[in-house]
Amino acid sequence: MEESEINLVDSFEVSLLNDDSKDLLATVGDTGLDAIITGGTLDGVPILGVLNGIFKVTKNYQMRRLYKKMVLFLYGLSDFSQRDKENFLHEYTVANQEKGSEVLLAVIDKIDNANKISILCNLMRAKINGEISIDNFVRLCQVIERLPYVDFKNLVKYMVDYSELGTDDVLSSSGVIY
């Protein structure tokens, strides 16, 4: 792994586990996300400072998208304690047999719609609260990556006997229905 990748992963882990970021992240709810990204308000959060720095140098659109997803992710988990997040990362590391923060960063990066970040946060919340196992968390992360955001809204229809041409195939291939 290159040094820049290590710094990105390490800064993500520090940002995730650091309770001091809560005050900065609280501004997300009060201000428009795009204004925060452009203004550099959250550069004090290590991962966000790194991503914003890379974006300023490269003007890479993907980096801006990752920054936006990262803000939403950290904000969505800001009410959890450092200990809860440490325990989660440890369990996630063991389950993946790879550094948990690196795998989680890859999951966030692969998510194609920023609205799916709240779904990821809810899954992590369910895992931390003991409502799902770490194995199910890993599996459901794969579903988030594969399923188009628009089809998440259709899932509730499938709680009863329901079928919709086109949607059935996507949900089935994503492993959500059978």
Place the predicted regions along the sequence by residue:
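Short acidic/histidine-centered micro-motifs embedded in hydrophobic/aromatic stretches
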Residues: L48, I54-V57, F73-G76, E91, ...
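Short, surface-exposed loop/strand segments
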Residues: M1, I6, T38
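Long, helix-rich, hydrophobic modules that act as membrane-proximal anchors or helical bundle/coiled-coil regulators
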Residues: E102-Y178
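Membrane-proximal, non-transmembrane interface segments of integral membrane proteins
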Residues: M63-I132
